[in-house]
Amino acid sequence: MANRIDHEYDYLFKIVLIGDSGVGKSNILSRFTRNEFCLESKSTIGVEFATRTLQVEGKTVKAQIWDTAGQERYRAITSAYYRGAVGALLVYDITKRQTFENVLRWLRELRDHADSNIVIMMAGNKSDLNHLRSVADEDGRSLAEKEGLSFLETSALEATNIEKAFQTILSEIYHIISKKALAAQEAAGNLPGQGTAINISDSSATNRKGCCST
């Protein structure tokens, strides 16, 4: 997985991980991209990212996952990284009610800075700590439904629903750009050689076989 040669792909999708510090974003990133988990994971300083290439609807997609720091003092830095994102995983910790209460603030910031068509999933992380739960599964689902988001509870420690969360986001992004590509072809009269990048945002969902991203 980590050793796979991934320079050949059909699409590059940028996805941001957002949420309070300590909710497990970095471990979600390492579990999905390297199948690793670190019990002594330190808070992210600034921004870091990792990539993984996988198949989505028969296409080779390179997912570029950005882990943005949740601390208040870094929020001004991370806001710039919303630009170009076509997907987002908004994470809270099911054992810390305050991280759930802050979801709407993160969602508001995301919608202020990101493309209006961005695909968003909400994840209640650390489901392995069910005995310490302070946010009910129904609370998460209810808020996600109210805001029009997908929802899953996840565990980076046990690798529960990590794969499913990203596959869901990537598939939804692909469906959006596929519809846009079809509409563009119909508008162009299905003329051959219309090799353009089909994006839902600023050259971020980039068709490798079309033009280069900016």
Curated annotation (Swiss-Prot):
It holds the Pfam family Ras. GTP binds at residues 19-26, 67-71, 125-128, 155-156. Transmembrane segments: none annotated. A lipid is attached at residues 211-212 (S-geranylgeranyl cysteine). GO terms for biological process: cell wall biogenesis; protein transport. It is found in: Endosome membrane; Golgi apparatus, trans-Golgi network membrane. GO terms for cellular component: cell plate; endosome; endosome membrane; Golgi apparatus; plasma membrane. GO terms for molecular function: GTP binding; GTPase activity. It is a lipid-anchor. SUPFAM superfamilies: P-loop containing nucleoside triphosphate hydrolases. Keywords: Endosome, Golgi apparatus, GTP-binding, Lipoprotein, Membrane, Nucleotide-binding, Prenylation, Protein transport, Transport. Expressed in root tips. Belongs to the small GTPase superfamily. Rab family. Intracellular vesicle trafficking and protein transport. This is Ras-related protein RABA2b. The lineage of its organism: Eukaryota, Viridiplantae, Streptophyta, Embryophyta, Tracheophyta. The gene is RABA2B.
